[in-house]
C-alpha cells in the first residue's frame, strides 16, 4: 500500500500507524 495512508506500508511491520 502506501497510497491510502503515509504509513500503510509501514503498518505491515510496525502495526497501525501510530
UniProtKB/Swiss-Prot annotation:
Biological process per Gene Ontology, one example term: neuropeptide signaling pathway
A GO-annotated cellular component: extracellular region
Tissue expression notes: Found in the abdominal ganglia and perisympathetic organs. Not detected in the thoracic ganglia, subesophageal ganglion, corpora cardiaca, corpora allata, hypocerebral ganglion or frontal ganglion.
Valine amide sites (modified residues): 18
SS bond list: none
Highest taxon, organism lineage: Eukaryota
Alphabetically ordered keywords of this record: Amidation, Neuropeptide, Secreted
Compartments (UniProt record): Secreted
Protein's UniProt keywords contain Secreted: yes
Functional note: Myoactive.
Protein family according to the UniProt entry: Belongs to the pyrokinin family.
Name the UniProt record assigns to this protein: Pyrokinin
Species this protein is from: Schistocerca gregaria
Amino acid at each position: 500500500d502506501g497510497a491510502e495512508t503515509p504509513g500503510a506500508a509501514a503498518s505491515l511491520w510496525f502495526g497501525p500507524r501510530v
